[in-house]
Amino acid sequence: MLDKDLILNDNTCELSQISRHKTHVVEVGKVKIGGNNPVVVQSMALGVHIDADNIKSSAKHYAKEITELARTGSELVRIALNSEEVARAIPYIVEEINKEGFDGKILVGCGQYELDKLVQDYPDNIKMLGKIRINPGNIGFGDKRDEKFERVIEYAIMHDLPVRIGVNWGSLDKYLLQKLMDENSSLSNSRPSDVILRKALVMSALDSAKKAEEIGLNSNKIIISCKVSKVQDLILVYMALAKSSNYALHLGLTEAGMGNKGVVNTAAGLTYLLQNGIGDTIRASLTQRPGESRTNEVVVCQEILQSIGLRHFNPQVNSCPGCGRTSSDRFRILTEEVNGYIKTHMPMWKKKNPGVEHMNIAVMGCIVNGPGESKHANLGISLPGYGEKPVSAVYKNGKYFKTLQGDNVSEEFKAIIDNYVKKHYT
C-alpha cells in the first residue's frame, strides 16, 4: 500500500532541488561553465570550404552560419580546425560575427591530427578563439603523441585558453584500449568488451587532464567530454567521470542520429544526467536532413533544459493533442499561430520584458481538460470541442477572464498575450 504522507511530503522531485555536481568554473570569454552557473548550450557549425585564394569571402559565408546558430541561442559554437585555410580565416570570421554583435570568443576550435602544427604556424589567429578542443586519441601517435599534446597545452597556457579534452569512442587511444583489453583477457572472470571500452574512455579523459595539469594548465581551464553513440553508455561514462573528478563536463552523444531518433536519444541521455546534477554544457549532435538548418540542435538543447526547469528561454505553450472530442483543426491552428507569435516577438520581449521566458500558455481543444489546464497557466484558452457551444473561454492567472467567439479568436487571443506580457513583465 502506498504511503500517502510520503507522496504528499517528499520533495525529491522538486526541480528546484536538483543538486548540481560540484565542478570547477571555466571561463570561455564571457561565458562561465561549471560550478552553479547555468548549463551552457553549444552547437557546431557545418562549415564551408575555405577557398585559399579567397579567404575573406569564404570566411564571410562561414560566419553567416555561426551567426545564425548564435542568434538562435547557441552560447558557444565549435568550428573544425582542419586546415591552414581555416586558421587563416579566423580573423575574418571573428570580424564578421563581431559586426553582428557577437563576441569572437564564442568560437571553439576543434583540432584533430593537424592541431599541433596549426597552433605553431598560426598562433596569433588561433588565440582569438575562446577555447580549443583536443582529442587525445588522434592528436598524435606513438612517441609523437605526448610531444604534440604537450606543445598544444603549453600554447593554451601561454595564451590563457581553456581546453576541452574530448575523448570519442570512434577515435579512442588504440594503445590504451589494447592494453586494457589484453589485461582483461588474461583474467579468469573477464568483463564484457563494452565495459572495457567505457573504462578506456574515462581513463583516457582523466589521464589526459592530469597530464595537462602536470604541464601547467590549471584545473579551471579544463573541460572534459567522453562521446559515445549509445544512451546507456553515455550515462554510465558520465556517472563515472562525475564520481572521479571535479572537472567541468560537456555532455552529448557523438552521433545522435536524424529526426525523431536523434532528438529522443539526445533527450533520453542528457535529461537523465542533468536531472542527477551532471553536466555543465550540452550539445545535440543531430544529423540534419539535406538543406536543413543546424539551428535545430540549439532548439533541442534549449527545450531539454527548459523541460526539466534548469533554464527558461521562451514562454511555454502547453497544447492539446486532440481526440474524438475535438471537432476541428482550430486548436492546432491556434497552437501553431501562438508559437509563431512568440517566436516573432521574443527578440523584442527579451529586451523590454525580462522574465517573459517563464510565462506559461495553454491552448486546449475541448471542455474536458481545457478549463483545468488553462487554470494552471498564466494564460489559457479552451476551444470548443464536438457538440459544445462555439465559444472559447480564456483564463488568466487561474481565473476565468473572458469568452471569445467568431472569426477573430486567434487575433484576439494574441492581443491578450501581448497585453499580459506588457503588464506583468516590465
Curated annotation (Swiss-Prot):
Keywords: 4Fe-4S, Iron, Iron-sulfur, Isoprene biosynthesis, Metal-binding, Oxidoreductase. Its cofactor is [4Fe-4S] cluster. [4Fe-4S] cluster binds at C320, C323, C366, E373. GO terms for biological process: isopentenyl diphosphate biosynthetic process, methylerythritol 4-phosphate pathway; terpenoid biosynthetic process. Pathway: Isoprenoid biosynthesis; isopentenyl diphosphate biosynthesis via DXP pathway; isopentenyl diphosphate from 1-deoxy-D-xylulose 5-phosphate: step 5/6. Binds 1 [4Fe-4S] cluster. It catalyses: (2E)-4-hydroxy-3-methylbut-2-enyl diphosphate + oxidized [flavodoxin] + H2O + 2 H(+) = 2-C-methyl-D-erythritol 2,4-cyclic diphosphate + reduced [flavodoxin]. InterPro entries: Dihydropteroate_synth-like_sf (IPR011005), IspG_bac (IPR016425), IspG_bac-typ (IPR004588), NO2/SO3_Rdtase_4Fe4S_sf (IPR045854). The keyword Metal-binding applies. Converts 2C-methyl-D-erythritol 2,4-cyclodiphosphate (ME-2,4cPP) into 1-hydroxy-2-methyl-2-(E)-butenyl 4-diphosphate. It comes from the Bacteria. The gene is ispG. It comes from Wolbachia pipientis wMel. Its EC number is 1.17.7.3. This is 4-hydroxy-3-methylbut-2-en-1-yl diphosphate synthase (flavodoxin). Belongs to the IspG family. It holds the Pfam family GcpE. GO terms for molecular function: 4 iron, 4 sulfur cluster binding; 4-hydroxy-3-methylbut-2-en-1-yl diphosphate synthase activity (ferredoxin); 4-hydroxy-3-methylbut-2-enyl-diphosphate synthase activity (flavodoxin); iron ion binding. Disulfide bonds: none annotated.
